C-alpha cells in the first residue's frame, strides 16, 4: 500500500522553497532587470506596487523563512522583498524595504 500526502504549504514545503530562494538570492546583483531576476528566482510569492513622486516602485516578495510546524500562517518576516524602480533591481531585504518606503513616502513639511 502506498500513501501519498500533499505538502503544499506544509512546513517541509515552505522550508524547501525558502532554502532554494535564499540560495538563488546569492546571485542577485543591483541593476538586474525584472526578466533577469525572474529567470534566476522564479515567480515571487506576492508583489506590492507603489507610485510615489512619479516613480514606479515595485516589491517582489520571496519566501525565505519556512513556516514552523505549529504556525498556521506566513508572516511578513517569512519573506524577503526585492525592490525595483522602473523595472531595475535597486536592492533587497526587509531593512531595505522599510527604509525605501519610509524615505520615498516621507512627508515634507514646509518651514514658515
Model-derived segments and their meaning:
Residues 3-6:
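C-terminal motif of bacterial Sec signal peptides marking the signal peptidase cleavage site
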Residues 8-112:
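Residues within mature, well-folded domains
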Amino acid at each position: 500500500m502506498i500513501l501519498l500526502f500533499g505538502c503544499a504549504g506544509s512546513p517541509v514545503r515552505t522550508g524547501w522553497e525558502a532554502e532554494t530562494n535564499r540560495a538563488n538570492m546569492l546571485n542577485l546583483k543591483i541593476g538586474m532587470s525584472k526578466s533577469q531576476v525572474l529567470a534566476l528566482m522564479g515567480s515571487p510569492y506576492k508583489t506590492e506596487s507603489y507610485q510615489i513622486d512619479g516613480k514606479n516602485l515595485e516589491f517582489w516578495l520571496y519566501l525565505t523563512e519556512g513556516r514552523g510546524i505549529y504556525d498556521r500562517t506566513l508572516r511578513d518576516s517569512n519573506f524577503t522583498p526585492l525592490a525595483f524602480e522602473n523595472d531595475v533591481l535597486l536592492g533587497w531585504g526587509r531593512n531595505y524595504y522599510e527604509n525605501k518606503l519610509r524615505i520615498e513616502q516621507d512627508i515634507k513639511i514646509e518651514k514658515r
